[in-house]
Regions:
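Membrane-embedded and juxtamembrane structural elements of multi-pass membrane proteins
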Residues: 1-246
Length: 246
């Protein structure tokens, strides 16, 4: 669209009699023509950026889809605690839990038929109370529809990748989502130390999780330490509870 506008401007300026163009206008016309010549390059850079980020997003979705092949049903003891957590959060839809041997961090996949993936090692490394806290974090993501918001945010970041403010705002939104779910986990177990030690235990096993999943373990050590400091030093912020898009 911008290329069309500048092309029309160029044709209009070319049609003006030379005598009617003052010396003061010529530099501006020259600048506009120079900019119009660069617009195709800007378009090409934008298309390349969108294509690269779209490929990354699709690769993440494909990676998430491939998790189903190796996923295992959770044992009855975990299923029992999971169903109890579902009732606490008022989630009556088709939400499932699966164990996976190749991941080390819990996360949520899916918008309408959500699946909570837990690392296989979490069943033995976490205490029942720690497991409840971790499940509460993931179920809060589902209750808030964070998986959908994350996809929308990723799409916006793909289209407007050239704007630093988009990435800054996106990082803040992801941070707020995790803090909201941390607060839900603390409220569920009523013991910040239990949840903090669960996070530390998961961090010790961490290898990485898909980028388009909803996870509280896919982050740097500094971010994790900041969250743990907040968990141990602050009470849950009730103002964050009702902000599903944050």
């Amino acid at each position: 669209a911008l290329t069309f506008v500048y092309e029309e401007m160029r044709l209009f300026q070319a049609a003006l009699p030379a005598a009617n163009i003052s010396d003061a206008v010529l530099p501006e016309i020259s600048r506009q023509l120079h900019l119009s010549a660069l617009l195709p390059w800007f378009d090409a850079i934008w298309l390349i950026g969108v294509a690269a980020l779209s490929f990354r997003m699709l690769a993440g979705l494909w990676q998430v889809h491939g998790l189903k092949k190796q996923a295992q049903p959770a044992p009855d003891s975990v299923q029992y605690r999971f169903k109890a957590a579902l009732r606490r959060f008022g989630l009556t839809g088709k939400v499932q839990i699966r164990l996976h041997p190749a991941i080390t961090g819990p996360f949520v996949v899916g918008a309408f038929r959500s699946v909570v993936y837990l690392p296989l090692s979490a069943v033995t490394s976490l205490s029942p109370e720690q497991l409840d806290a971790v499940l509460s974090h993931e179920l809060e993501h589902i209750r808030r529809a964070d998986y959908v918001w994350n996809l929308i945010q990723s799409l916006i970041e793909t289209l407007f990748f050239y704007h630093p403010a988009v990435w800054w705002i996106g990082a803040k939104m992801r941070e707020q989502r995790e803090l909201c779910c941390d607060d839900a986990a603390i409220r569920s177990c009523d013991d910040p130390i239990t949840y903090a030690t669960a996070l530390l235990s998961l961090e010790e096993q961490r290898r990485g999780v898909p980028s388009l999943s909803m996870t509280h373990n896919g982050q740097g050590k500094s971010e994790l330490l900041a969250r743990i400091s907040r968990i141990l030093g602050e009470k849950p912020d009730s103002r964050l509870k009702a902000r599903p898009g944050a």
